[in-house]
C-alpha cells in the first residue's frame, strides 16, 4: 500500500485543533477552530475524493482517541465522510493502548517505523494518515510517506503544534496537483521524490 498523509494547516504550519476550539486544547492551546470559517463545497468534494482512495486509516493514539470519541456520534446520512471513516480498518500506532473501541481497529505496538513498514508492504491502495502530526512527521522523515496532501487555511494561528516542526531529515517533494477554493483554502498534493534537491543561486539571468 501507499501511505498518504493528509493534514490541515495554517499559514504558519499549525496543525492543532482545526475543527473547533475544544478539539485539542493540549499544551494550553486556545486557538482551535481556525479551519471552519473557510470550509466550502470544493473542500468537501476534494477531501471526500481523497478519502475514497483509502483502504485503511493509520493514526497516532491521540488522534485515534479523538476520532473514536467523535465519529461514531455523527448520524447525518448526508455527511460524505461518516460511513467511510467508521467502516474503514483503523491502525493505531501506540505502546499504551492494548485494544481499540472504534471497530475495526488493529493496535500496532513496537517501533513505529518497522511496524508501519510491514503494513505498507501489504497489497492495497492507500493507507491514510489524518491528523496524527507527530506520526506523520516521523514517517515522512523516514521515507515511508508517498503522498502529502495539505489543506492550507489563510490564517496565522501564532501558537500550537506544527506539522513539520524540526523534521529529522530533509524531504524532497514534487507538486502534482493544486487548487484554490472560493474561500481561499489551498488544496495541495505532493509526491515524495528520492532526495530533497538543492542548488546554488547564480542570478536571475538563467531564468529570463
Residue locations for each model-derived region?
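Portal/gating segments that form or line small-molecule/metal binding sites
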Residues: 1-144, 154-208
Amino acid at each position: 500500500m501507499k501511505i498518504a498523509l493528509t493534514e490541515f494547516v495554517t499559514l504558519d504550519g499549525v496543525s492543532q485543533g482545526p475543527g473547533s476550539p475544544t478539539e485539542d486544547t493540549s499544551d494550553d492551546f486556545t486557538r482551535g477552530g481556525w479551519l471552519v470559517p473557510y470550509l466550502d463545497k470544493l473542500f468537501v468534494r476534494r477531501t471526500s475524493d481523497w478519502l475514497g482512495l483509502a483502504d485503511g486509516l493509520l493514526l497516532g493514539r491521540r488522534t485515534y482517541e479523538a476520532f473514536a470519541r467523535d465519529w461514531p456520534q455523527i448520524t447525518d446520512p448526508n455527511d460524505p465522510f461518516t460511513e467511510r471513516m467508521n467502516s474503514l480498518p483503523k491502525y493505531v500506532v501506540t505502546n499504551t493502548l492494548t485494544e481499540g473501541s472504534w471497530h475495526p481497529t488493529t493496535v500496532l505496538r513496537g517501533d513505529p517505523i518497522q511496524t508501519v513498514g510491514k503494513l505498507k508492504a501489504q497489497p492495497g491502495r492507500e493507507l491514510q494518515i489524518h491528523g496524527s502530526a507527530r506520526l506523520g512527521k516521523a514517517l515522512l522523515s523516514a521515507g515511508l510517506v508517498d503522498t502529502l496532501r495539505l489543506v492550507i487555511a489563510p490564517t496565522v494561528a501564532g501558537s500550537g503544534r506544527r506539522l513539520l516542526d524540526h523534521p529529522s531529515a530533509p524531504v524532497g517533494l514534487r507538486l502534482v496537483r493544486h487548487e484554490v477554493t472560493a474561500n481561499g483554502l489551498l488544496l495541495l498534493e505532493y509526491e515524495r521524490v528520492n532526495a530533497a534537491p538543492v542548488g546554488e543561486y547564480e542570478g536571475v539571468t538563467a531564468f529570463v
